[in-house]
Amino acid sequence: MTARQIVEMATGYCGVSNSELARRLGWSPQLLNKRLNTGKFTVEEWERIGEALGAVARVGFKFPDGTEI
């Protein structure tokens, strides 16, 4: 799943447009679209996107033995 797909699913679930998400992040809609096109976000940006949508972004690893980091 791409970053764009994840954000589109999350904004759709919340009923928030990309323009509104950009506003909540303090970004222009053009910057958000550029970032969605490249798929390049820092962990901190994922956390901010989650907060802007009233969610918690989780980034980590899950190993075959069930260990999560």
Where are these regions (language model features)?
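Residues within the alpha-helical elements of helix-turn-helix
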Residues: 13, 24, 52
